[in-house]
Amino acid sequence: MRYIRLCIISLLATLPLAVHASPQPLEQIKLSESQLSGRVGMIEMDLASGRTLTAWRADERFPMMSTFKVVLCGAVLARVDAGDEQLERKIHYRQQDLVDYSPVSEKHLADGMTVGELCAAAITMSDNSAANLLLATVGGPAGLTAFLRQIGDNVTRLDRWETELNEALPGDARDTTTPASMAATLRKLLTSQRLSARSQLQLLQWMVDDRVAGPLIRSVLPAGWFIADKTGASERGARGIVALLGPNNKAERIVVIYLRDTPASMAERNQQIAGIGAALIEHWQR
């Protein structure tokens, strides 16, 4: 009998993680899909090992929206590490280079901004013109997609510039990723030798300094927890966040959540993402 019991335990240990995971986060996601009348994609990944802890529609495509700006600045930092770029280099631009929602770059038409300042604006304030100016330095959308392929991401693709890339048409593969691919790419940028240790810390700090993510996971974060994140939004039923989370002010897990094809208001989308985040945190603390 003891031998049989040991065999059963060994067999259970080989089953996919989803079998063991508490259903609570997944139940919250299913509830969110019902309330949103749309689709939710999510993955929770251990930062150190890359192990998937929880997943839902993790291999389905979702619009990246402004979450692509983290990958963009990762590509910029890779060029810095290679000696092809400098964060201190000043970029000058004109009024016609500005697009909708450029709260930082619109104030610096006269003096321009450095590459580092543009990355900070793109991530912390989601400045769209800053993102376009940076995109030009890496070869545009095609150049950023090529960078993704070079680091082993064969799924994520950027096809357009701000602000067209936020169109989020149903069934459109342009400017999309999957939760699993985005999480794996973010992990590569922050833990592998794709970036120097200095560049990894800089990318993480820009995400820590995010100033436009308040209504999402930050709104349910317990005291003393770490968060670094980047959000994305579309007027056509999409919303997203990529984040690093952990208790004791340590980044331990990557969480990626995307919504698409929902008629819900932006406030409702924010609330649902916050609810999923709260469920993950509660499950984590058990």
Curated annotation (Swiss-Prot):
Family annotation (Pfam families): Beta-lactamase2
Record: active site: 66 (acyl-ester intermediate), 164 (proton acceptor)
Top-level EC class: hydrolase
Keyword list, A-Z: Antibiotic resistance, Disulfide bond, Hydrolase, Plasmid, Signal
Annotated PROSITE patterns: BETA_LACTAMASE_A
Disulfide feature: 73-119
The organism's place on the tree of life at top rank: Bacteria
Signal sequence, renumbered to the chain: 1-21
Catalytic reaction equation(s): a beta-lactam + H2O = a substituted beta-amino acid
Binding residues for substrate: 230-232
GO molecular function terms noted in the UniProt entry: beta-lactamase activity
GO biological process, one term: response to antibiotic
EC number assigned by the record: 3.5.2.6
Listed NCBIfam families: bla_class_A, SHV, SHV_LEN_OKP
UniProt similarity note: Belongs to the class-A beta-lactamase family.
Note: The class A beta-lactamase family has a specific amino-acid numbering system, sometimes called Ambler or ABL numbering and often misspelt as Amber. A multiple sequence alignment was used to derive a consensus sequence and then the consensus was numbered taking into account insertions and deletions. This allows use of identical numbers, e.g. for active site residues, despite differences in protein length. UniProt always uses natural numbering of residues, hence there appear to be differences in numbering between this entry and some papers.
Function: This enzyme hydrolyzes cefotaxime, ceftazidime and other broad spectrum cephalosporins.
Name of the protein this chain belongs to: Beta-lactamase SHV-3
Organism: Klebsiella pneumoniae
